[in-house]
Amino acid sequence: MVNVLINGYGSIGKRVADAVAKQDDMKVIGVTKTKPDFEARMAVEKGYKLFAAIPERKHLFEEAGIPVEGTLDDIIEDADIVVDGAPKKIGKANLENVYKKHGVKAILQGGEKAGDAQDSFNSLWSYDRCYGKDYIRLVSCNTTGLCRSMYAINSVADILKARIVLIRRAADPNDIKTGPVNAIVPNPVTVPSHHGPDVVSVIPQLDGKIMTSAVIVPTTLMHMHSIMVETSGTNRDEIIDALAKTPRILTLKASEGFDSTAKIIEYSRDLGRSRYDLNEIAVWEESVNVVDNEVYMMQAIHQESDVIPENVDCIRAMLEMESDNLKSIEKTNKAMGLIK
């Protein structure tokens, strides 16, 4: 049983905490918050030991009537690994100023740059490379989703060139500061977007073969990808079969009512998923087509949750708890109640 500390109990951190708590080979020894908000109070109510991420703010929790066990410095030495859930760019600062100082292994999230850590993690592609490493970046929700679909395609044919258009949600449901509300925004307006190079940080053999562009649209539910991949040779049946065999990919049919991201989220609600999380990515089966060995398909990504099981697998890899990535994936999925 390994000790996991969650530094930053926010959108990602609280989900990772719940996922880790469901595993039988790891436990959450504490979570941190920078301010005494409702998430901090709920963390305590759920039984997590709460620590102030910033020592100077400990008194704010006490004044708000939220019990804290101490500060980050009081618990970090007990951790075998820290999962950093801090906002973008803060993770790198935490790595340099906290984790390396205390000699504790750490997982950064996708908001940090590839060069900030020793490697970039995806359960299917880079588990072996990250095995036993000290500081790893777990790639973003979009990159995680693309890595899964590229894995499926690569299992039946060589990828010669990949072109992906990402239609990104404007904000998470709880975000009142981000937009747009009434616009479609190229993000970035230049091509390629950062997503292609990010995929390459996980899958080096796609260097020079992947091109991505991205726009932001006024929705909060999910991202969507329109994928076009030139291959050495395949057919639709092979791709459908590969998607079905690849972990954490669901193939859903518009003919059965899955005709929008809203319906996919409704499905997740009906599954009884906490926070309506869909840790699996969803590929529309009708969108899968192969013309002259070029694969076309569309997939949806729940931006708040597809990286969560990857964090659990990354813990096992870095702490050398399981050498077989597929066994770790299976163990994580079973504990979290994933479909596949």
Swiss-Prot record:
Presence of keyword Oxidoreductase: yes
Pfam families in alphabetical order: DapB_N, Gp_dh_C
Any one biological process term the GO annotation gives: lysine biosynthetic process via diaminopimelate
GO cellular component, one term: cytoplasm
Family annotation (InterPro entries): DapB_N, GlycerAld/Erythrose_P_DH, GlycerAld_3-P_DH_AS, GlycerAld_3-P_DH_cat, GlycerAld_3-P_DH_NAD(P)-bd, Glyceraldehyde-3-P_DH_2_arc, NAD(P)-bd_dom_sf
Gene3D superfamilies: Dihydrodipicolinate Reductase, domain 2, NAD(P)-binding Rossmann-like Domain
PROSITE patterns assigned to the protein according to its UniProt record, in alphabetical order: GAPDH
Pathway(s) served: Carbohydrate degradation; glycolysis; pyruvate from D-glyceraldehyde 3-phosphate: step 1/5
Alphabetic keyword roster: Cytoplasm, Glycolysis, NAD, NADP, Oxidoreductase
EC code: 1.2.1.59
Residues at the active site: C141
Annotated GO MF terms: 4-hydroxy-tetrahydrodipicolinate reductase; glyceraldehyde-3-phosphate dehydrogenase (NAD+) (phosphorylating) activity; glyceraldehyde-3-phosphate dehydrogenase (NADP+) (phosphorylating) activity; NAD binding; NADP binding
Principal EC category: oxidoreductase
Reaction catalysis annotation: D-glyceraldehyde 3-phosphate + phosphate + NADP(+) = (2R)-3-phospho-glyceroyl phosphate + NADPH + H(+); D-glyceraldehyde 3-phosphate + phosphate + NAD(+) = (2R)-3-phospho-glyceroyl phosphate + NADH + H(+)
Binding-site residues, NAD(+): S11, I12, G111, R169, Q303
Localization per record: Cytoplasm
Residues that, per the record, bind D-glyceraldehyde 3-phosphate: S140, C141, N142, H195, G196
Subunit description: Homotetramer.
Family, similarity comment: Belongs to the glyceraldehyde-3-phosphate dehydrogenase family.
Protein name: Glyceraldehyde-3-phosphate dehydrogenase
